[in-house]
Amino acid sequence: MTLNLCVLTPNRIVWDSEVKEIILSTNSGQIGVLPNHAPIATAVDIGILRIRQNGQWLTMALMGGFARIGNNEITILVNDAEKGSDIDPQEAQETLGLAEANFRKAEGKRQTIEANLALRRARTRVEAINVIS
């Protein structure tokens, strides 16, 4: 038995395929979803989506949004998403370094919050590349 997973951003469909299992980062922690999972709607945190398909684990960096799970259908609507395999490791590391520098020199509450958000996004992209499947 499989799950139909659809990952959408405002601009494109990132993933639309059958999968065996997912592990999703939500605002209240990670949840694993297998076929016949109880229906749920949840907020999606900035984090890694792990996808098991054809005996392999794949990763995707998600940048926050919402998920709806029910009847073996998973729809995830996020602000942005990138498959781990599509992320350039060198560019991701450079972005992380820049985000860390910006966080260190942030002044004021607003700058600190924005820098922290950029840092979380950069770390998530690097993690999506480095997750051992």
From Swiss-Prot:
Subcellular location: Plastid, Chloroplast thylakoid membrane
Xref: SUPFAM superfamilies: Epsilon subunit of F1F0-ATP synthase N-terminal domain
Keyword set includes Membrane: yes
Membrane topology: Peripheral membrane protein
CDD domains named in the record: F1-ATPase_delta
Predominant subcellular localization, coarse grouping: plastid
Subunit composition and interactions: F-type ATPases have 2 components, CF(1) - the catalytic core - and CF(0) - the membrane proton channel. CF(1) has five subunits: alpha(3), beta(3), gamma(1), delta(1), epsilon(1). CF(0) has three main subunits: a, b and c.
Protein family: Belongs to the ATPase epsilon chain family.
Task performed by this protein: Produces ATP from ADP in the presence of a proton gradient across the membrane.
Protein name as catalogued: ATP synthase epsilon chain, chloroplastic
Gene that this sequence comes from: atpE
